[in-house]
């Protein structure tokens, strides 16, 4: 997918970094906080899924919560949310500044300023004055997200 002009997001669980690529050229790098169980099994532990995904839904802000026993939380006005697999998303995290260390319930946390940059760089585009956008295979595929150890 590293074809000339193709945008894609590379996330390393081990180094806790996110790199934005345009083809084979890196254009932005920042620290992240992925799932607190590191390389554990997603779905059974608080780890981030690994694999190749696409951003399929974006929200300027949203409420995020969990119904998992012993891991309940509710966070309102989470900024710059980009879902890539089920309830897993890249998003801004205003509640901590511990980037570069595992910490989340499985999402990929970014500093709000970094999340904003990624949000406007990645597709699907959110039209002016809209709050959210959804990718459609028929009209526009979301940006590739590659998450690996």
Question: Predicted regions span which residues?
Answer:
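Cell wall/extracellular polymer interaction/catalysis modules
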Residues: 1-50
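Conserved hydrophobic/aromatic pocket- or pore-lining residues that grip, position, or stack substrates
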Residues: 18, 55, 82
């Amino acid at each position: 997918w590293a074809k000339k002009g193709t945008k894609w997001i590379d996330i390393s669980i081990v180094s806790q970094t996110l790199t934005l690529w345009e083809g084979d050229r890196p254009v932005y790098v920042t620290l992240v906080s992925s799932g607190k169980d590191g390389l554990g099994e997603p779905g059974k532990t608080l780890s981030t899924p690994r694999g190749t995904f696409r951003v399929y839904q974006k929200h300027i802000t949203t409420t995020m919560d969990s119904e998992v026993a012993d891991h309940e939380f509710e966070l309102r006005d989470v900024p710059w949310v980009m879902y890539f697999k089920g309830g897993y998303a890249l998003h801004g995290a205003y509640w901590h500044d511990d980037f570069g260390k595992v910490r989340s319930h499985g999402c990929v946390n970014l500093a709000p300023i970094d999340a904003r940059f990624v949000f406007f760089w990645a597709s699907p585009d959110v039209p002016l004055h809209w709050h959210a956008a959804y990718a459609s295979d028929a009209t526009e595929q979301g940006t590739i997200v590659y998450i690996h150890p």
